[in-house]
Amino acid sequence: MTTHTGTPPTPASPPLHLQGRILPEGEVCDIWIADGRISREPVGGSETIASGGWILPALVDAHVHLGIAEIGGPLDFEVLRNDLRHLTHSGVGAARILGSPERLPAHMLSRPGEPELLTAGVPVAAFDRFIPGWGRRVPDRLLAPACADEARCGWSKIIADWLGPDGGYGPSFSAHAIEAAVSAVHGIGARIAVHTQSSVAGARAAAAGVDSIEHGMHLPPSALDDLAAHSGFLVPTGFVFEQLKESMLDSSQPADLRRWFAEGLENHPDVVIGARDRGIPVLAGTDLPVGALVDEVVWLHRSGLSAHDAVGAASWTSREVLDLSRLRHSDRADLIWFAHDPRDDLEMLRSPELAVIGGEVSAAAP
C-alpha cells in the first residue's frame, strides 16, 4: 500500500519515518529523519509520513543563477528569497550557483528548510567579453589569482569565450592562462567550472583539466576525451538554448551569429551522447530563468540519456559528483517521495507528493 500523511509536521513533531523503494538502486528500505539528518537505523517515537512508493534524493539544479531581477543588474535579495522558496517547494534540495553579481553571504549557503547552495562567487571574465555590469574583469595574466580568490566557497568560474567585436564567438583567454587558473584553484582544494560555447575555448578548458564544462554546444569530441581523462563532468543547460532558438535565429541577427547558434543547437545532443558514451557524468542545470529543471531533464532524455540517467542528472548523479547529501546515514535530510516511479513519467517530477528539504517537510500533496 502506498500512503503518506499529507500533513507537514510542526517544529515540535517527533522524528519522521519513510518506507519505499529508494533510487537509484530501487530496493525497499526504511529511512528515519531526526534533527534534520538521515538515519538508516530505527529512531524511537518516529511518525511515519510515507509508506510504499519511491524515494529519491532531493533534486539538484547544477547550474543556476539566483536573485537576478534583470540581466546585468545587481543581486536582488528579495528575488533571491523568492527563488529559494520556489526551489524548496519544487523539491530542489541543492543548487550550484555558477556566478552571481556579488558573493552570497555565507549564512545563506545551508539553512534548515532551504536548498543547500554551492557558489562560484563572481564569474571571472575578460574585458568587454561578458554581460555588461556582471563579472570580475581581468587580463590574461591575472586570471589565475582572480579565480583562486573567487573560489573561497569551493568553486570558481571562468567565462572562457564570448561574443567578439566582429560578431563571432571565440576564446577570451589563452590556453596558458586557463591552465594556470586550473592549477591555482586546484592548489587551494577548490574546483573550477568553465562557460564555453566555442570549440577552441572548450578544447583548451578540457585539456587544462577543468572540473566542469558548462553549456558546451560546440565542444569537439577531442575535448570530451580530455574531460573524461580528467574525471570532469558536463552541464549542457540545453533547454535554455531551445527557448532562445526563435530570437537567435531571427533574420535580424547577424549571419555569423545565426550560423554559430544553429550549428551549436544541432550539435548539442551529440555532445550529450558523446559524454554519455565516454562515461562522463551529465548533470541537469537550468541557467536562467529559475524553475526549468524538469524541462532540462526532459531535454536530456530527448537528447539521448535514458530516463533513469536523466532523472539521476537532477538527483543522485549530481549529488554524488558535487559531493552533496544522498540519503546516507547522518546526511542532511533532502529527499522527495512519489507514489509511482517518476522514471516512467518524467512530468511527475514537477510535483513531488512529499519533499523534505534541509530536514523540514516543505511540500505534501493533500
Where do the protein language model's features map onto the residues?
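Metal-associated gating/positioning segment near the N- to mid-region
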Residues: 53-111, 128-133
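Hydrophobic faces of well-ordered beta-strands that scaffold small-molecule active sites
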Residues: 58-64, 95-97, 118-121, 156-158, ...
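Short amphipathic alpha-helices and their capping/turn segments at secondary-structure boundaries
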Residues: 40, 45-47, 51-53, 104-111, ...
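Acidic/histidine-rich helix-loop elements
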Residues: 66-77, 127-138, 165-171, 246, ...
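Histidine/acidic-residue-rich, glycine-tolerant segments that coordinate divalent metal ions
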Residues: 101-204, 208, 212
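His/Asp/Glu-enriched, well-ordered alpha-helical/loop segment
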Residues: 187, 259, 264-341
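N-terminal metal-binding scaffold of metallo-dependent hydrolase/deaminase domains
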Residues: 1-44, 50, 54-55, 340-345, ...
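Active-site core of metal-dependent hydrolases
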Residues: 165-266, 277-283, 288, 306-310
